């Protein structure tokens, strides 16, 4: 997009907002109880609603008012500086190869023309392809890729459509790629577009979306839905928390995730469906505990809320892709939290490793747009699950055969075996 065309592009979200204002879309801010101050992130987090009484919200009247942010000028110079590394840091990127199948696949994706982003479309892939451009920029320093990322960030603001019609799953799947791309391109250095994107993220995380799947904010979905909806919402929520520097909500989100993995003492406020795949129906969890059995069959590591999508318990299980789909959101949550200092990959006796071991035990390997997951899981655990390269990107993440493939290979002989 040419620079002189940007002011016109910015008018469309504004005109849409004016039109939608007459419909009074509901914007709900999910209250967040204050959590105790700690010197480091905790492996066990503060109980939340569903696991005990939440502390009341106390307004900090002494907090200074935020300084006004400058108006966005699309023709202003674009600064380039080191970025924070929500997903990868500069020193990590510098070690990654610029040759091989994974790199060539990433480069081809970065050079692919993109249609306008549509966050209201749960199958839109603009987010992961914009992430490809950001990764190539961060590795090569080629400014045209950064310019393309900034164009994409500019275009996505307002692409969520009418909250009364947009579904929360679409929003959750599409947001992480944009957030991480913005971090890789050091969008915060932009005096106008940077603050504009931050304000938009604040709006996205507090807006109630009423489309298919129910009416939720990102945090409300994360704390209620123990299936793929909730895991994707958690990934988007955590990515935004990290980008905005919201440590309080980050800790709350970590607590919810730990509860989903199986620590009901941390959080147990989810609403589950049929419990026929739960090892302990009276105390349902997102991932069955180690050694769990149903009718004499080992179901430790199974995702009950997704396994039931193919029907009540039976053996062998009827195949469903929902288990891998839920893991797309879960492994992104774990990686983001791990980089922020939370030992999320280790929680509940390495629950995510056990989940993948269960799927391999019943011969359900990652296929299609789940192919990126084994690279990340192998890197996290030093495991050796089958991993394909070039790997297809997923609904909320991709390119891990390049970003994490080297780590996977280095750790394969030193960590957990894929068979347990």
Regions found by a protein language model. Give the residues of each.
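Intrinsically disordered, low-complexity acidic Ser/Thr-rich regulatory segments
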Residues: 293-317
